[in-house]
Amino acid sequence: MIITIDIGGTAIKTGFMQDGKLTTLAQYPTDPKRENFSMLATLDNILDDILAEYPEADGVALSSAGVIDHQQGRVAFANENIPGYKGTELAAHIEATYHLPCSVDNDVNCALMGELSLPRYQAVDSALMFTIGTGVGGAVYLNGDLYRGPTFSAGEVGYSIINGQPIERVASTTALVAYVKERVDETVRDDVDGKWIFAQAKAGHAICQEGIEWLVQHLTTHIVNAVSLLNPEVVILGGGIMEQVDYLRPLIETKFKELYQNTLVLRQTEIAFAQLGNRAGMIGAYEVFKTKHPA
């Protein structure tokens, strides 16, 4: 039994993998703004709770926000969403404190590995994943393994430039909300979020439909550029708004075909949507653990 923990900027999800199945446990607030916040102390409290109930655990698999040195199990870089997180020695601390093997990897890397564990992807040798949320995240899987780069930053696509702007400013949920808020009547601006936009778009709201098409244009341009460079078998799209599959799939596929101009390299890439939701990171963390600590 392997404990799985998914560390995000606002919440920490927990569970365990046993016999290839995920059992979800409690979710804890990250609460990084509280006085004397310590991620290691927070994890200790969580692991104390879990191990009190499941003392038979054989290891700990972590998925985490930030740029992760998976070899050392440390946070190579993190922004101030989690203050003081950069440099945190996650694996070394857990292994020394609990005498359990530990693995750590980036959250989008783990999400991709979780999705690729599904039976439909068992023969896939190359894949990309993009997650659309507050920002835009990415992960790269080539020749049957995650590609992380020499500084563990492969997939940090939020810094990519589309039409002179970082992609996060034109293809994230945050960008979509800002686009719509600027254009709707001020009496409804406080209501505008991703769910509201899609509900209104489905009801025929022209500005919301226009905003989604604006996002899709930029996102699909980014996908075409990435696919042209790496020629993956599949691109998997995840994140909250990508759950709107019925609305987004035809828009994205149509724009993708329009942009790729029928070239062979792009025509053979499948555009897929994530299926595991919030479970992907924990399942993928387990997949990374198995590679680092083979039985």
Which residues make up each language-model segment?
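Glycine-rich phosphate-binding loop of actin/hexokinase-like ATP-binding domains
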Residues: 122-174
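A charged helix-plus-loop insertion that forms the helical arch/lid used to bind
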Residues: 74-87
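A short acidic/small-residue loop/turn micro-motif
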Residues: 30-32, 83, 154-156
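Active-site nucleophile and cofactor-binding loops and adjacent substrate-binding regions
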Residues: 80-83, 103-109, 129-131, 272-278
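A cytosolic small-molecule/anion-sensing beta-strand core signal
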Residues: 18, 64, 142-143
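ATP-binding/phosphotransfer module of carbohydrate and carboxylate kinases, centering on a glycine-rich
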Residues: 1-59, 69-74, 96-99, 117-126, ...
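Short beta-strand segments
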Residues: 6, 61-65, 129-135
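Conserved phosphate-binding catalytic cores of ATP/NTP-utilizing and phosphoryl-transfer enzymes
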Residues: 91, 101-127
